[in-house]
């Protein structure tokens, strides 16, 4: 049996990311055999991961990667903001963002992609490995990508913890033959606008018919309450619909940076200034945890439950 020294425990900890006491126990159980200890930790870790997988993961990070005419964004969730500040977790999200770019935003292709330095593990398997080593439930929640033949895909990260990692990530695609550096500058400003204004659609044509009919019905009922003639009511509804578009459609929104120009006009003017038409190629906005229902815990009940065990 090999002597279980502090150096051996430290080495195992560095290789696995497991806690010091867990590493010491693993070496004791395997008579100091490091490879066997790694396997022992993995087995124990995976068993623990299965229990953790049921817990709500609504914290974490949004990661972004861009490469000229293409860009990708991914959301990886964890249970606590503490883990989001962990170097290992941040490194994982950075790597996954780059892999998302290669996978063109396809979440299934991303999950099955080989994880660099992961000893043959896929990205999905690496998530399970991290659950075991870091000790929290994690989830590769969603991914998306944008690409243009000519132009740029640029990004903006709000509340960034480091470049490309943060809470709100935005991609904006601009199609144009104009100078890429100038386009990138414009795209970043529009991406900042998207982060703040939260549009749901790029163009009016993208607003789904059901949402539009529902909005028109609500506005019509509101207008009828005024008791005005039908012709006036119709004009009131159309006016309010324009307001609705300004709230949810990016090209119809007022640019937050100047507070007076519609995004469509901003693009039109920039195209004239740069000597080439500029067309919006789309946008993606990921906000960490949006749509996830967080668990409301009753601390007293949790303590009582633990005392009964």
UniProtKB/Swiss-Prot annotation:
Subcellular location per the Swiss-Prot or TrEMBL entry: Cytoplasm
Keyword Cytoplasm: yes
Keyword annotations of the record: Cytoplasm, Elongation factor, Protein biosynthesis
GO cellular component: cytoplasm
One GO MF term: translation elongation factor activity
Disulfide bridges in this chain: none
Chain intervals for the UniProt region annotation (Involved in Mg(2+) ion dislocation from EF-Tu): 80-83
InterPro entries given in the database record: EF-Ts_dimer_sf (IPR036402), Transl_elong_EFTs/EF1B (IPR001816), Transl_elong_EFTs/EF1B_dimer (IPR014039), Transl_elong_Ts_CS (IPR018101), UBA-like_sf (IPR009060)
NCBIfam families with a match to the protein in the record: tsf (TIGR00116)
Alphabetical list of PANTHER family matching this protein: ELONGATION FACTOR TS (PTHR11741), ELONGATION FACTOR TS, MITOCHONDRIAL (PTHR11741:SF0)
Function: Associates with the EF-Tu.GDP complex and induces the exchange of GDP to GTP. It remains bound to the aminoacyl-tRNA.EF-Tu.GTP complex up to the GTP hydrolysis stage on the ribosome.
Family according to the record: Belongs to the EF-Ts family.
Protein name: Elongation factor Ts
Organism of this sequence: Rhodospirillum rubrum (strain ATCC 11170 / ATH 1.1.1 / DSM 467 / LMG 4362 / NCIMB 8255 / S1)
Gene responsible for this protein: tsf
